[in-house]
Amino acid sequence: MHCDIYRSSKKDEMYIYIARPNYPDETEQADPFEKVPEAVLQAFGRATFVMHLELAPTRKLARVNVLHVLDSLQTKGFFIQMPPEGLINPNAVEPEGLRGA
C-alpha cells in the first residue's frame, strides 16, 4: 500500500497518512484529503507534505504499528499519527533559573 505523509501545522509530531491505492497508475490529481472528515482537517491544520512511502506488513515504523496504519488506510483512506505522550510533564519541577520568571 502506497501512502503520502503530511505534517500538521497545529501540533508538533502529528502526522496524517493518506492512502494512494492506485499509485503509480493515477491519471488525475484528485484532492488527497477528500476522504478525511472536515472536523479532522480543522483539528489538523495546514498539511505540509513530508514523504511518499510504500507500506507492507513487514515494514517497521518508528512510533506506530504498521498493521494499524494499513488497516486504517484500507478502511478509511487515512491514518492519524498522534504526537507521543509524556514528552512534556506539566507537573515537573521548574529549573532553578526559571522560578519566579
Swiss-Prot record:
Domain YcgL: 1-92
Pfam families: YcgL
Name this protein carries in UniProt: YcgL domain-containing protein A1S_1688
SUPFAM superfamilies documented for this protein: YcgL-like
InterPro entries in alphabetical order: YcgL-like_sf (IPR038068), YcgL_dom (IPR027354)
Alphabetized Gene3D superfamilies for the sequence: YcgL domain
